[in-house]
Amino acid sequence: IHAEQAAGFDLNAACSGFLFALQTAQAYIQAGIYRTVLVIGVDSMSHMVDWSDRSTCILFGDGAGAVVLRESKEGLFVQAAHSDGAKGDVLTGCSRHRKNWDHPDEAKAAYIQMDGQSVFKFAVRRVPEIVEELLEKARIQKEEISYFFLHQANRRIIEAAAKRTGVDISRFPMNLQEY
């Protein structure tokens, strides 16, 4: 892209990485450091899954997307970033464990492992809370939002979160069935 006056760095945070990168880009723009930022999100997870474990292999794959953010006086960008370290054992693998191919049990521990029920409950509880937080920060009402774009991991999570948020599911676009 011949960007001679540019900086580049890797921000690695799995599913949340693209959102953290957007927040970082917005902060650079808001601080006046850059006027235009290219954010590229890439996940390469297929080598980290146990293909015999249907609870994870259907959820974690490879993909990429990009967006260009520019300085603008129009529009709205509010953000919220949360984590819960107490839930660290709910989704583990790869960086936490080394693969030891000589010992199959140890090699299996290196793959992504997830307590799907806990992830489901957490997401369904937290998404409506975060939607309310963002609406409050933006000083707008749910009715003013055309679409709510959620992480495309699980249709049931999105449907349950929409119901708990009190917003019709038609305003939560989904494309997971295509992948």
Where is each model-derived feature located?
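Condensing-enzyme catalytic core mediating Claisen C-C bond formation in acyl metabolism
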Residues: 53-121, 125, 129
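Conserved catalytic cysteine-centered active-site region
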Residues: 1-36, 163-179
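Phosphate/pyrophosphate-binding loops at sites that engage ATP/ADP/AMP, CoA/4′-phosphopantetheine
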Residues: 129-146
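Flexible, glycine-rich active-site loops centered on histidine and acidic residues
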Residues: 28-64
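Glycine-rich phosphate-binding loops at beta-strand->alpha-helix junctions
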Residues: 145-164, 179
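Acidic, glycine-rich active-site loops and adjacent beta-strand->loop/helix elements
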Residues: 13-16, 41-46, 82, 178-179
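Acidic-glycine-rich active-site phosphate/pyrophosphate-binding loop
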Residues: 1-2, 38-45, 98-105, 157-169
